[in-house]
């Protein structure tokens, strides 16, 4: 299984997060860099661990949290959907298991503050 720590060190993913943050900064949004995605990732993992979810689900929550705003690279509007599509590609190319991809992509695609719903434990 692909790990959260492996993703954090991935140069391609780091580039997308950096550029998404730059785009949002140019539009006047608050910080969405590594501090933000790391905080979301760690918080999601902590919540699931505290609630007694499996270590696998905790890891998937960390991964989803880390990638959740990557769609801001494309545009802030509908960033959860574009982020889910981007995450699918990134995870698939890293040989992530299909069931893990499905869980992560569903969580990312449903995280938008205006329309998101917790469709699974990772979301």
Task: Give residue spans per PLM region.
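Active-site flanking loop/helix segments enriched in acidic
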Residues: 14-49, 66-73
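Charge-dense, low-complexity intrinsically disordered segments
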Residues: 7, 27, 31-34, 77, ...
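Non-catalytic interface/linker regions that flank or bridge core catalytic/transmembrane domains
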Residues: 1-15, 23
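Generic serine detector
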Residues: 3, 23, 33, 41, ...
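N-terminal glycine-rich anion-binding loops that anchor highly charged ligand groups
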Residues: 11-18, 56-59
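Divalent metal-dependent catalytic cores for phosphoryl transfer on phosphate-bearing substrates
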Residues: 51-123
């Amino acid at each position: 299984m692909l790990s959260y720590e492996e993703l954090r060190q991935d140069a391609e993913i780091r580039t997308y997060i950096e550029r998404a943050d730059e785009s949002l900064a140019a539009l006047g949004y608050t910080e969405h860099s590594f501090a933000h995605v790391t905080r979301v990732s760690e918080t999601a993992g902590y919540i699931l661990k505290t609630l007694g979810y499996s270590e696998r689900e905790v890891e998937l929550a960390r991964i989803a949290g880390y990638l959740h705003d990557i769609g801001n690279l494309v545009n802030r509007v509908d960033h959860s959907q574009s982020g889910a599509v981007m995450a699918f590609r990134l995870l698939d190319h890293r040989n992530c298991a299909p069931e893990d991809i499905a869980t992560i992509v569903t969580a990312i695609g449903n995280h938008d503050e205006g329309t998101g719903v917790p469709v699974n434990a990772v979301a």
